């Protein structure tokens, strides 16, 4: 579903709601899927992996979120850069100190778009 006929609005809804819910309920079995998606050649799977925890708030696996952002920091693809910033911005509403620390440590590797989006609420 994510790859076939995909566009950002379709992918974002599935990632944040369906995939995100599955990740919460089946974290151990979904983790390998997300690990595969973050390195997938398809940009929509990579975007879905980044956005999969968008609504998790205090249940966010920050280690996974930050790892995925690091692994895709080199991306030139707009939709991935935007997803990184959005995911970090949303998590900053729950744990601003963690996101600020991540940006201090890794911010130079991120695109300007990702950094700006991530820092909007800091």
Regions found by a protein language model. Give the residues of each.
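Alpha-helical scaffold domains
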Residues: 1-122
């Amino acid at each position: 579903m994510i790859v076939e006929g995909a566009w950002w609005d379709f992918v974002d809804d599935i990632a944040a709601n369906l995939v995100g819910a599955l990740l919460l309920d089946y974290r151990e079995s979904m983790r390998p899927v997300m690990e595969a998606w973050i390195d997938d050649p398809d940009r929509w799977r990579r975007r879905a992996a980044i956005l999969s925890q968008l609504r998790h708030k205090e249940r966010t696996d920050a280690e996974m979120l930050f790892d995925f952002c690091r692994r895709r920091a080199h991306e030139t693809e707009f939709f991935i850069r935007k997803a990184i910033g959005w995911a970090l911005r949303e998590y900053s509403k729950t744990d601003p100190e963690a996101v600020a620390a991540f940006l201090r440590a890794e911010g130079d590797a991120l695109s300007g778009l990702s950094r700006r989006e991530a820092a909007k609420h800091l």
